């Protein structure tokens, strides 16, 4: 599994627009993108400008395909204006079998 942990900080004046865009992107990613298994969106309780996304894909190729989707490109257009900072960390999922 290919996993992304994305941390962003959003400009306060664009929070509502950003929230709508990321929720649409996350929902459509899981529904439509082949190989996208999970897309969790978290907003920090004590600072609503800070967000974390937890994304799970079959492999990096599935993530690359996701980045060419119409819903991602629509989100990116908003994110490019709304984000103050972004940090992306890539992980390999390790499955523990009992």
Can you say where each PLM-predicted feature lies in the sequence?
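An amphipathic, aromatic/His-enriched active-site/gating alpha helix that lines ligand/cofactor pockets
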Residues: 24-36, 56-89
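Short, glycine- and small/hydrophobic-rich beta-strand elements in well-ordered beta-sheets
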Residues: 27-51
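Short, conserved charged micro-motifs
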Residues: 14-18
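Active-site-flanking beta-strand signature of metal-NTP-handling nucleotidyl enzymes
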Residues: 2-8
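Glycine-rich beta-strand-turn "strand-cap" elements at beta-sheet edges
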Residues: 40-49, 75-98
């Amino acid at each position: 599994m290919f996993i992304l942990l994305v941390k962003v900080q959003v400009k306060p004046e664009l929070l509502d627009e950003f929230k709508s865009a990321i929720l649409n992107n996350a929902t459509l990613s899981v529904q439509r993108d082949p190989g996208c298994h999970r897309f969790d969106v978290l907003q920090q309780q004590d600072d609503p400008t800070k967000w974390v996304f937890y994304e799970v894909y079959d492999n990096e190729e599935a993530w690359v395909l996701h980045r060419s989707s119409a819903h991602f490109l629509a989100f990116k257009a908003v994110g490019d204006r709304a984000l103050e900072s972004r940090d992306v960390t890539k992980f390999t999922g390790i499955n523990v079998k009992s």
